[in-house]
């Protein structure tokens, strides 16, 4: 018996020792990683000089997507990449303004003698963002320094940036994949019918198509007509820019589906030769041949065993002066939600607080609101608008810079501005409001579950498990109609028009920036630089600096966001890994749609949101 007890005691003793060893090992490993990260952060950010020892190229090796305002986890991903060459399945976000600032600094850096665009890991960005980067690349070229693009193949987004280069190399086995733009969404009516879900839709606006997925299985003719117009304009703008850069015609660049098929047939299906023959690229070359050419241009680095170049992620950008008068830059990037900001979304309370801080700061002389949003909560949009109006009333000029989209609620928050600058390819307008309430009384009834009770008023008897009372439906529709009238009145007052005239161009209609200028919804066409210059002009500033209002996350908050985000990202990825490719693709689409719906948290269930704007690809 004693032997048995000794064996049991020995088992628990060794088990504890093993667990304790693992615990200590894990804690020490975490501590070591934290020390290395802190050292790396200090070494990366303590230096403010942009000079590096050897002359060479700036390697613009952008990984992931370009956005106005990257999330905290993306910033941590950049640090991890710099320190350990770490990679992640999560899509890395890169700041548009950091990229442009880097290119402009490199233009004046005597040690940077050119730029190499290596875009194999670049996913893309909205068209106005790409144009802004292209503008910086053109300025770099105009300074007398060359820009080269290298790639085994080019997607549409990659090729757009590559077109700004002096020379484009393409692999002999590669292609330039031009196919056009599309906007697609899921429609749920048949599914909801099969599930016996009762859908109650409240909306104002002929073209307010955000509710169509709940009540149709396809696009309405009005939505198809409107979307065909603006997506065609975006595609034409895309072609015109590249054609001008390549000094060819838009027809030569993209002769249509049949034209491409006929052209490929002439060269036996050789996509690389087709690209060369049609002047889409300048030369077909293997990676070895490209390396030789770049080595001849920039020299050889023994340390890197490659041509001399410094990665965009390793290039130290000088800290700009923060002395004197400032122009505040506040971001409204993503769907507008009620409450605090979450990654990828605009928090009504968070953004309003930033505007208030800028209003009360005596050093801030003007505000530029950078809007890149399809809209969202009406309540949150109004909270932001009111605070922006207060800043304007306090005597601080307010200028709105519209990015890829400033539609619906994104336009609502723009109305107090003294001046609105949009890109020709901005998607804006979509002036309309909707609400959707789904109830599942029939679904539950089909399996024998019913809801019953008493209430002092039909207005109190609201539940997703019961039929929506007619009185509540009437109140909802009245609320939506009131919200729409308020929306067009705000626009009319801001644009010095009348509600009747605004109603003619509203009704949920999406406009490109070019059309919005013609309709009087924006003041001028331009980019972020133009908006800043206008703000300085209105504030009568001769010198100024920009103060970007974005909360810098702590290291631990970045770690937490990264870990939770990785879990959120890895679960769907793990599930999709077991699915056939077509099913996995559909699952990813469903997830993207559900993420959009998750941002709908308006307390009054009223939304000014442009669904099609967020679906373009």
Where are the model-predicted features located?
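C-terminal recognition in membrane/secretory proteostasis and scaffolding
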Residues: 446, 540, 545-550, 610, ...
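C-terminal long alpha-helix characteristic of the crotonase
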Residues: 245, 263, 282-326, 434, ...
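Cleft-lining beta-strand/loop regions that shape enzyme active-site pockets
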Residues: 51, 58-185, 194, 320-443
């Amino acid at each position: 018996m004693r032997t048995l007890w000794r064996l049991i005691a020995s088992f628990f003793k060794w088990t504890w020792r093993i667990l304790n060893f693992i615990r200590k090992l894990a804690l020490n490993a975490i501590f070591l990683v934290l020390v290395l990260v802190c050292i790396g952060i200090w070494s990366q950010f303590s230096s403010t000089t942009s000079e590096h020892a050897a002359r060479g190229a700036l390697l613009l090796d952008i990984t992931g997507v370009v956005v106005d305002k990257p999330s905290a986890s993306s910033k941590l991903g950049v640090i991890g990449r710099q320190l350990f060459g770490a990679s992640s399945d999560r899509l890395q976000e890169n700041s548009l303004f950091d990229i442009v600032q880097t290119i402009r600094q490199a233009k004046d850096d005597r040690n940077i003698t050119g730029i190499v665009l290596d875009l194999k890991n670049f996913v893309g960005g909205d068209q106005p963002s790409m144009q802004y980067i292209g503008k910086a690349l053109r300025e770099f070229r105009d300074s007398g320094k060359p820009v080269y693009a290298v790639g085994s193949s080019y997607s549409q987004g990659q090729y757009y940036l590559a077109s700004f280069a002096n020379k484009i190399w393409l692999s002999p086995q590669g292609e330039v994949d031009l196919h056009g733009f599309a906007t697609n969404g899921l429609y749920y009516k048949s599914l909801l019918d099969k599930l016996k879900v009762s859908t109650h839709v409240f909306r104002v606006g002929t073209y307010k198509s955000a509710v169509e997925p709940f009540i149709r299985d396809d696009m309405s003719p009005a939505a198809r007509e409107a979307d065909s117009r603006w997506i065609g304009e975006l595609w034409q703008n895309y072609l015109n820019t590249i054609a001008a850069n390549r000094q060819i015609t838009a027809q030569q660049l993209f002769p249509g589906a049949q034209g491409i098929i006929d052209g490929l047939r002439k060269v036996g299906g050789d996509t690389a030769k087709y690209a060369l023959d049609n002047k889409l690229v300048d030369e077909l070359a293997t990676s070895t041949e490209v390396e030789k050419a770049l080595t001849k241009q920039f020299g050889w680095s023994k340390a890197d065993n490659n041509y001399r170049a410094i990665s965009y992620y390793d290039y130290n950008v000088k800290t700009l002066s923060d002395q004197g008068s400032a122009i505040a830059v506040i971001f409204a990037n993503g769907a507008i939600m009620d409450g605090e900001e979450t990654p990828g979304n605009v928090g009504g309370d968070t953004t309003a607080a930033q505007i208030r801080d800028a209003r009360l700061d005596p050093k801030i002389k003007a505000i530029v609101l950078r809007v890149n949003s399809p809209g969202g909560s009406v309540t949150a949009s109004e909270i932001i608008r009111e605070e922006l109006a207060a800043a304007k009333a306090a005597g601080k000029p307010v200028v709105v810079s519209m990015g890829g989209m400033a539609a619906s609620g994104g336009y609502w928050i723009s109305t107090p501005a003294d001046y609105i600058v949009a890109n020709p390819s901005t998607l804006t307008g979509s002036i309309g409001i909707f609400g959707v309430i789904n109830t599942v009384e029939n679904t539950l009834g089909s399996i024998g579950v019913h809801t019953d009770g008493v209430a002092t008023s039909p207005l109190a008897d609201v539940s997703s498990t019961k039929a929506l009372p007619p009185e509540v439906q009437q109140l909802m529709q009245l609320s939506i109609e009131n919200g729409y009238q308020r929306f067009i009145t705000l626009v009319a007052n801001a644009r010095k028009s009348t509600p009747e005239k605004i109603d003619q161009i509203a009704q949920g209609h999406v406009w490109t920036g070019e059309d919005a200028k013609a309709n009087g919804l924006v003041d001028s066409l331009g980019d972020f630089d133009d908006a800043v210059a206008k703000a300085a002009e209105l504030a009568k500033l001769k010198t100024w600096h920009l103060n970007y209002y974005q909360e810098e996350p702590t290291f631990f908050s970045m770690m937490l966001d990264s870990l939770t985000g990785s879990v959120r990202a890895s679960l769907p990825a793990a599930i999709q890994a077991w699915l056939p490719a077509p099913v996995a693709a559909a699952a990813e689409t469903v997830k993207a749609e559900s993420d959009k719906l998750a941002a709908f948290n308006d307390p009054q269930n009223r939304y000014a949101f442009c669904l099609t704007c967020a679906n373009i690809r």
